[in-house]
């Protein structure tokens, strides 16, 4: 593999995104799932798509009702290494069609607060199984900032498995202030399944998960004014949308459209005892050094698929202003206009981490000393990972 053209691999709980350094978009994006058929071999003939013993990504997604599905990653962290290696094989050899990964370079992403053992095992597999010549592991939130051309700011990175609030100052993650919220895209989908079930639509949490995820992506939004939207939903049909299911049935979705993503702001709705994303963001910035707070408030960057809901940026801004008003100004309106917030919601934020990784990998492509080399790994082992900087 050409060592001057590094691979960029952004592995998320929900989707794997893979491509080359310097690109504006991943070449391939596929669900981070591994499926094994539930049916016995003789029953498989009745299924239109031929079932293999192991199916990965989109091919597994298409026939998921016949499969036992495994998610190798939970909350951004690799839990099942055997299946993770199957995902990597699929990404490198089936999707990218690399003849070999030997001596190539790869930039991998990881969530903030990723256990060190996780990072260590990732490097070990890349060197010892795939024989890469150079490996670099970058923190997702920092890459999202790079994609925006910033080196300081607060990243609200909400993916499928976990939401992180990460303050970064001059490219260094302020890890003591990083907050993790265990509510993200997957929880919103599950919550939507429960809300629709209460209305009498029978959805199965596993087989219909993908269908409901698509309903969520098409119809859900974050409410700016909950009372107003609830009143509208109760008294009018203004919010009702029809959605055609894959089997041809049509369902009507009304107040569930804003009730499902509300769990990001009120985690108690999905039995998570944590403050919502607005309050967590406020607490994070307020815990930072007083000298950098205003620069952090002016550079809040949304990243990840679960930050794509219409209405999310304005609701976040509203919550920050309300919290500032009540907790800092003690309800004195005279100084409220001094509080400046800027929330950046770039249209490509679903792929922000990949884009930032592609930028960084292309800057580093010819700078061999910046990568962790196979030789360094063999000589020093895990202690060589200090190369990736503070975490």
From Swiss-Prot:
The modification N-acetylmethionine is found at residue 1. Signal peptide: none annotated. One of its GO terms (molecular function) is ATP hydrolysis activity. CDD domains: ASKHA_NBD_Arp2. GO terms for cellular component: actin cortical patch; actin cytoskeleton; Arp2/3 protein complex; cell cortex. Gene3D superfamilies: 3.30.420.40, Actin, Chain A, domain 4 (3.90.640.10). Present with 6650 molecules/cell in log phase SD medium. Component of the Arp2/3 complex composed of ARP2, ARP3, ARC40/p41-ARC, ARC35/p34-ARC, ARC18/p21-ARC, ARC19/p20-ARC and ARC16/p16-ARC. Functions as ATP-binding component of the Arp2/3 complex which is involved in regulation of actin polymerization and together with an activating nucleation-promoting factor (NPF) mediates the formation of branched actin networks. Seems to contact the pointed end of the daughter actin filament. This is Actin-related protein 2. It comes from Saccharomyces cerevisiae (strain ATCC 204508 / S288c) (Baker's yeast). The gene is ARP2.
């Amino acid at each position: 593999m050409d060592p001057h053209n590094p691979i960029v691999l952004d592995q998320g709980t929900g989707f794997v995104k893979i491509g080359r350094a310097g690109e504006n978009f991943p070449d391939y994006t596929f669900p981070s799932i591994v499926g094994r058929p539930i049916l016995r071999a003789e029953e498989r003939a009745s299924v239109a798509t031929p079932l293999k013993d192991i199916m990965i990504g989109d091919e597994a997604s298409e026939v998921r009702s016949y499969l036992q599905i495994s998610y190798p990653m939970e909350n951004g962290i690799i839990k099942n290494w055997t299946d993770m290696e199957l995902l990597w094989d699929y990404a490198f050899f089936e999707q990218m069609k690399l003849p070999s990964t030997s001596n190539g370079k790869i930039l991998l992403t990881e969530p903030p607060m990723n256990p060190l053992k996780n990072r260590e095992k990732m490097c070990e597999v890349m060197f010892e199984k795939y024989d890469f010549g150079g490996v670099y592991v970058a923190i997702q939130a920092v890459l999202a900032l790079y994609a925006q051309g910033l080196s300081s700011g607060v990243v609200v990175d909400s993916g499928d498995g976990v939401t992180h609030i990460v303050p970064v100052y001059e490219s260094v993650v302020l890890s003591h202030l990083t907050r993790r919220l265990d509510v993200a895209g997957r929880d919103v989908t599950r919550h939507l399944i429960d809300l629709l079930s209460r209305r009498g639509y029978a959805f199965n949490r596993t087989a219909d998960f993908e269908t409901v995820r698509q309903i969520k992506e098409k119809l859900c939004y974050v409410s700016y004014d909950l009372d107003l939207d609830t009143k509208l939903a109760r008294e009018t049909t203004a919010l009702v949308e029809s959605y055609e299911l894959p089997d041809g049935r049509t369902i009507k979705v009304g107040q569930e459209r804003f009730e499902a993503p509300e769990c990001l702001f009120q985690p108690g709705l999905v039995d998570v005892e944590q403050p919502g994303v607005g309050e967590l963001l406020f607490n994070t910035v307020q815990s930072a050094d007083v000298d950098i707070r205003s620069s952090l408030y002016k550079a809040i960057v949304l990243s990840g698929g679960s930050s794509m809901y219409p209405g999310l940026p304005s609701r976040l801004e509203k919550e920050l202003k309300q919290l500032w008003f009540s907790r800092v100004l003690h309800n004195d309106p005279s100084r409220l206009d001094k509080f400046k917030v800027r929330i950046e919601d770039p249209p490509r934020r679903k792929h922000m981490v990949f884009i930032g990784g592609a930028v960084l990998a292309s800057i580093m492509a010819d700078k061999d000393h910046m990568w962790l080399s196979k030789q360094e790994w063999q000589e020093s082992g895990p202690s060589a990972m200090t190369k990736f900087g503070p975490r």
